[in-house]
């Protein structure tokens, strides 16, 4: 998503062509998702080819451990298979956190996953939470011209990251017109 936004907005070329440069005027959600799909397919192919070149087996399946070194694979349309290995890497991905105090409805209030179902880019948005995903979405949508306000109860973004890096991140976020509301709690939604 980030790479698609950087490409479509022309952000990386602005130091050459000026701050108003963009690859496409009036970027739509369809443009963003189309470019995101292209980036994902391309990057997936690169990683898959690198893994295969290095003799690593890949299996897309539901897996469960039989014992410490054996995995049972269940794939649609194929027989159940067992694989034994000294080392196993489990890549499950992540799910969006859902604060129980926030009434996610998929219409006005979205998780990061649901944001990808938008038909149009919003004119403005508030991002609740200054963790990795919140910061990523705030910066992506700001680059696309959306007015973004990021609210976080903590006094500093990404507390596990070096201060100099965060200072640079905050500078660039503000430069892209992200409003930061740190050390503030969301008490209600309108």
Name the predicted role of every residue range.
Residues 1-121, 154-158, 164-176, 181, ...:
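Glycine-rich flavin
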Residues 119-156, 160-161:
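Rossmann-like NAD(P)H-binding beta-loop-alpha module
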């Amino acid at each position: 998503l980030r790479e698609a936004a950087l490409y479509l907005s022309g952000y990386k070329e602005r130091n050459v062509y000026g701050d108003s440069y963009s690859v496409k005027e009036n970027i739509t959600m369809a443009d963003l998702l189309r470019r995101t799909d292209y980036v994902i397919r391309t990057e997936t192919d690169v990683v898959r080819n690198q893994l295969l070149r290095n003799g690593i087996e890949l299996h897309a399946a539901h897996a469960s451990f039989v014992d410490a070194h054996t995995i049972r694979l269940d794939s649609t349309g194929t027989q159940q298979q067992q694989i034994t290995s000294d080392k196993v890497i489990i890549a499950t991905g992540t799910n969006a956190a859902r604060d129980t105090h926030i009434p996610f409805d998929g219409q006005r209030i979205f998780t990061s996953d649901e944001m990808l179902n938008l038909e149009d880019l919003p004119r403005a948005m508030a991002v609740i939470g200054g963790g990795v995903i919140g910061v990523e979405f705030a910066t992506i949508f700001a680059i696309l011209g959306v007015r973004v306000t990021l609210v976080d109860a903590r006094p500093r973004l990404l507390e596990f990251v070096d201060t100099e890096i965060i200072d640079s991140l905050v500078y660039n976020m503000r430069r892209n017109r992200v409003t930061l509301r740190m050390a503030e709690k969301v008490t209600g939604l309108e």
